[in-house]
């Protein structure tokens, strides 16, 4: 049996992971990360609930204080991208640098052979000795999109015990069976450091000024005024405050000129994208190849052609044009249920662009 550290967020998923591994006879250590100063230290917080579950299971529990690192690596990056008119996904960066970076280092320092998390994803090892990341049995909860940037070195040191569990109801049933205090606790919010998922309020609290500017039609006409580019996202329709013969959508966020560009629905469709900072879990099969990709978490994989470019970039051409390709989000490539790799969406491409 192994000495395994479990990333315990105080939620149902990671608590069940700890209980399952203990049931299997492993020596389990609980680690809870404190990433930002909580509003309280009582019930419902990761530190409290993680420690409570660890005490129930009779396992050691460690609180890892990472507030300065999380601020520097994740929150400041998030704010900077919004300043540039992009729509970031901080969870992907957090997984690579924090959970499977600093937390994994702490697990090794505590003598753990492996780090286990409550992610819904599967990791297998192929005949070639390479680790493969695959979608979870529970497709509705699959989190493989968020882990595309993990390296082989990271994947060799982690396990995902919930990857084969078919439903969240089954996880909750296990939590109840283990008598865990968090068995009925709700799922966590989308971005952990943004209170009430109010992005605009958070960004303004962090120093981004709500600078009004023009809302411009793709044809060039000034149609109205916006209340700050950080308050808008690609594909947004509601809240524009514009009367027009057809529904209008946000097509572009130009923070350098303080403009929001809008247009009719057909202008949201893009033929492809340019990806940057591309990384691969397994080597790409060729410099140009067909596969499928997701351009946001809840997007269904769509057929595409990938062309590798210099400087860890790539061009992606969709078989059918896709709606709301958003700079700052991520494109992740799949071959059937296997994650190949991915990268940050740098720009959307129309059919006329090279």
Swiss-Prot record:
Localisation: Cytoplasm
Primary location class: cytoplasm
Site (Interaction with tRNA): 119, 329
E.C. designation(s): 2.8.1.13
Disulphide-bridged cysteine pairs: 94-192
EC primary class: transferase
Catalytic reaction annotation: S-sulfanyl-L-cysteinyl-[protein] + uridine(34) in tRNA + AH2 + ATP = 2-thiouridine(34) in tRNA + L-cysteinyl-[protein] + A + AMP + diphosphate + H(+)
Positions of the catalytic residues: 94 (nucleophile), 192 (cysteine persulfide intermediate)
GO annotation, cellular component aspect: cytoplasm
PANTHER family attached to this UniProt entry: MITOCHONDRIAL TRNA-SPECIFIC 2-THIOURIDYLASE 1, TRNA 5-METHYLAMINOMETHYL-2-THIOURIDYLATE -METHYLTRANSFERASE
Functional summary from the UniProt entry: Catalyzes the 2-thiolation of uridine at the wobble position (U34) of tRNA, leading to the formation of s(2)U34.
The protein's name in its UniProt record: tRNA-specific 2-thiouridylase MnmA
Organism: Trichlorobacter lovleyi (strain ATCC BAA-1151 / DSM 17278 / SZ) (Geobacter lovleyi)
